Design a protein with these regions (language model features):
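Core beta-strand residues in small-molecule sensory/regulatory alpha/beta domains
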Residues: 104-106
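Generic serine detector
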Residues: 22, 96-98, 102, 113, ...
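Well-ordered beta-strand positions in beta-sheet-rich domains
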Residues: 16-18, 102, 114-118
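Hydrophobic beta-strand-centered segment that forms part of the acyl-chain substrate-binding groove
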Residues: 48-98, 112-113, 119-120
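Hot-dog-fold acyl-thioester-processing enzymes
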Residues: 2-68, 124-149
Length: 149
């Protein structure tokens, strides 16, 4: 990804997450309808956590969850029916109670969309936000984008 709004995702700190596209996600123009990209980001986040060593189910078992508080995307080109999608995921920022992930939706080496999402850590008992736990912080720090190191 390039441009001032997104840090460059560096292969050494990204986790590629394959995403299966489905027929129902395509519109009359034969491309993935734009709302699906946000669902893909969330799906990629849960797969990303598993890949880096703290599966979403373990986070929940520890009494924690995450809530999306901000998301954004820039479209560069369409994903067309039958194309294989991979989303590169990297940690952009880690705060005291939140973290930001960057996403690059690509087909082959071509980035079709880029985005970011801010998640806040919350307690599963409904008592509110919590500090990013040490285990989660550790796996996120291992994938901080080079722009943030």
């Amino acid at each position: 990804m390039t441009g001032p709004d997104y840090p460059k995702l560096v292969a050494a700190v990204t986790v590629p997450v394959p995403i299966a596209t489905s027929y129902f996600q395509y519109d009359q123009q034969g491309v993935v309808f734009n709302m699906w990209y946000f669902g893909w980001f969330d799906d990629a986040m849960t797969q990303f956590l598993g890949e880096v060593g703290y599966p979403y189910t373990a986070l929940n078992a520890d009494g924690l969850d995450v809530q999306l508080v901000h998301t954004e995307a820039d479209w560069r080109d369409a994903v067309r029916y039958g194309e294989q999608v991979v989303i590169d995921v990297a940690t952009e920022r880690i705060g005291s109670t939140s973290f930001t992930l960057s996403f690059a939706v690509r087909v082959g080496e071509q980035v079709r969309s880029a985005g970011r999402t801010v998640y806040v850590v919350v307690s599963t008992d409904g008592s509110g936000k919590r500090p990013v736990p040490p285990k989660l912080r550790g796996v996120l720090e291992a994938t901080l984008t080079e722009a943030r190191r």
